[in-house]
């Protein structure tokens, strides 16, 4: 068997991102064969990922990537906020975003097979799991390709926004930040679904009917509230966050700009997190 040197262990650690002891054990098992040791670690990484697959991953970050007229946002989840800040996990999110942008995969399953800088996204994910010891999942992504421009905004990596727009670069940045702050549901009022409008109309009609006013007045009250609702939830109707005296629609008109589409991800949005009652756990332990 070839001698296992410190340099071999160090080189394997650099290649895999795993710990020194794991790398040394793999080299011993492979009898000093570097390629075989690397393969052993990849297999073990996959096994570790499978064992952790059922564990809830509700923390994480948003990764982004923009190249010319193509941009992508990706939500990647882990189990704790501590791991979400680790460079290895951040690298996974960035690699996933780049893969989405360059390959335009159909879904998360297809994304796993995309190769970035010589490695499949799934291999990068499994290596990160093996190194950091937490379950990690790529939850969702969005990709825009446009003849206009793409702007992204990340707020603490917990909120991510991507905007497909035309106009000055600063306008794109400002609109992306505005979306993160004001959270519109769509660009314009014609994009609000009929189902949403019907639901709001029912609520406002019931509220207005309680006023006891004539039917024609009630109808006007309902329409007024619907118009206010549309202004509150649409990007164009909202007061611009950096200058509330103007709407986003007016800002865009002044800058000869337009917004075709936007998307926003919030980490963990819609994932039911387990609430741990530590006081109850301590009390239960004390009774043992």
UniProtKB/Swiss-Prot annotation:
Pfam families listed in its UniProt record: EF_TS
Gene Ontology molecular functions: translation elongation factor activity
Cell compartment(s), UniProt: Cytoplasm
Record keywords: Cytoplasm, Elongation factor, Protein biosynthesis
CC per GO annotation: cytoplasm
Signal sequence residues: none
Region (Involved in Mg(2+) ion dislocation from EF-Tu): 80-83
Domain of life, per lineage: Bacteria
Disulfide bonds: none
Claim: Protein biosynthesis is one of the keywords in the record: yes
Entry-linked Gene3D superfamilies: 1.10.286.20, DNA helicase RuvA subunit, C-terminal domain (1.10.8.10), Elongation factor Ts, dimerisation domain (3.30.479.20)
Keyword check for Protein biosynthesis: yes
Family indicated by similarity: Belongs to the EF-Ts family.
Matches recorded under NCBIfam families: tsf
Record-linked HAMAP family: EF_Ts (MF_00050)
Function: Associates with the EF-Tu.GDP complex and induces the exchange of GDP to GTP. It remains bound to the aminoacyl-tRNA.EF-Tu.GTP complex up to the GTP hydrolysis stage on the ribosome.
Protein name: Elongation factor Ts
Organism encoding this protein: Chromobacterium violaceum (strain ATCC 12472 / DSM 30191 / JCM 1249 / CCUG 213 / NBRC 12614 / NCIMB 9131 / NCTC 9757 / MK)
């Amino acid at each position: 068997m070839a001698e296992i040197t410190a340099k071999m262990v160090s080189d394997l650690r650099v290649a895999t991102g795993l710990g020194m002891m794991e790398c040394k054990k793999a080299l011993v098992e492979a009898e000093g064969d570097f390629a075989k040791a690397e393969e052993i670690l990849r297999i073990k990484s996959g096994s570790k990922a499978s064992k952790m697959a059922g564990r809830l991953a509700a923390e994480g970050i948003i990764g982004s990537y923009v190249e010319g007229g193509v941009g992508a946002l990706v939500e990647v989840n882990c189990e704790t906020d501590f791991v979400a800040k680790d460079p290895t996990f951040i690298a996974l999110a960035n690699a996933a975003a780049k893969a989405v942008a360059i390959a335009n995969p159909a879904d998360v399953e297809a994304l796993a097979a995309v190769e970035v800088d010589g490695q499949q996204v799934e291999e990068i994910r499994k290596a990160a799991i093996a190194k950091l010891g937490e379950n990690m999942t790529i939850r969702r992504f969005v990709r825009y390709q446009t003849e206009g421009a793409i702007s992204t905004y990340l707020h603490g990596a917990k909120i991510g926004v991507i905007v497909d727009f035309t106009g000055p670069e600063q306008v794109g940045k400002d609109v992306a930040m505005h979306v993160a702050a004001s959270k519109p549901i769509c660009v314009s009022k014609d994009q609000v679904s009929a189902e949403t409008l019907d639901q709001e109309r029912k609520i406002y009609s019931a509220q207005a009917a309680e006023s006891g006013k004539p039917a024609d007045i009630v109808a006007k009250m309902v329409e007024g509230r619907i118009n206010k609702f549309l202004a509150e939830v649409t990007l164009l109707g909202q007061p611009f966050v950096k200058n509330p005296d103007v709407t986003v629609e007016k800002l865009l008109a002044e800058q000869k700009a337009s917004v075709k589409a936007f998307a926003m991800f919030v980490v963990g949005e819609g994932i039911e997190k387990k609430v741990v009652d530590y006081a109850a756990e301590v009390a239960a332990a004390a009774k043992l």
